[in-house]
């Protein structure tokens, strides 16, 4: 490395090595050895690990079919949302391991993980999924119970006399 004699030399060296800030980051395909894209999704206390690969639309959640694990149609609709937005319904086989939380939180975690896995498999899908908000982790969690109160915010009944 050349020695720097002045502040101008330092500025010149910094501008040559750093990337311009206006360039968009390049997203590349991330696949494992079996050709699957892997991502984790989170929602409330639930954590979902999602693997996708090209296939005919089979969805397996914790070793069970999605219809038996998520019996309520609303939960299955939440899972399908990312695929419907990008028009890739029945084009990927999806394997999911999910734990923690309740069924609603688990469905949200699977949706988050599936959206991330889709962007790892097809980086050009990032902008429509980000526009719909599927790549953003929902930060809302249950507020803790405080001492001196009945619940997180509810106080004990107050008696004036």
Curated annotation (Swiss-Prot):
The domain of life is Bacteria
Tell me its family: Belongs to the universal ribosomal protein uS9 family.
Q: What is the lineage of its organism?
A: Bacteria, Pseudomonadati, Pseudomonadota, Alphaproteobacteria, Hyphomicrobiales
- Disordered as annotated region, ranges: 1-25
Q: Which UniProt keywords apply?
A: Ribonucleoprotein, Ribosomal protein
Tell me which PROSITE patterns the record gives.
Answer: RIBOSOMAL_S9
**Name of a matching Pfam family:** Ribosomal_S9
A GO CC annotation recorded here is:
cytosolic small ribosomal subunit
> Which InterPro entries has this protein been placed in?
Ribosomal_Su5_D2-typ_SF, Ribosomal_uS9, Ribosomal_uS9_bac/plastid, Ribosomal_uS9_CS, Ribsml_uS5_D2-typ_fold_subgr
**Which GO BP terms, alphabetically?**
translation
Q: What is this protein called?
A: Small ribosomal subunit protein uS9
Point to the regions of Polar residues compositional bias. 1-21
Molecular function GO terms recorded: RNA binding; structural constituent of ribosome
Q: Which Gene3D superfamilies match?
A: 3.30.230.10
């Amino acid at each position: 490395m050349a020695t720097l004699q002045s502040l101008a030399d330092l500025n010149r060296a910094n501008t040559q090595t750093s990337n311009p800030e206006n360039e968009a980051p390049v997203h590349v395909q991330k696949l494992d050895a079996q050709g699957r894209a892997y991502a984790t999704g989170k929602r409330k206390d639930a954590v979902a690990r999602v693997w996708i690969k090209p296939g005919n639309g089979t969805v397996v959640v914790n070793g069970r079919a999605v219809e038996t694990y998520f019996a309520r149609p609303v939960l299955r609709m939440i899972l399908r949302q990312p695929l419907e937005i990008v028009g890739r319904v029945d084009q990927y086989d999806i394997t999911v391991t999910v734990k923690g939380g309740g069924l609603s939180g688990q469905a949200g975690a699977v949706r988050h993980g599936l959206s991330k896995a889709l962007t790892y498999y097809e980086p050009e899908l990032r902008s429509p999924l980000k526009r719909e908000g599927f790549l953003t982790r929902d930060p809302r969690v249950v507020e803790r119970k405080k001492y001196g109160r009945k619940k997180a915010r509810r106080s004990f009944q107050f008696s004036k006399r």
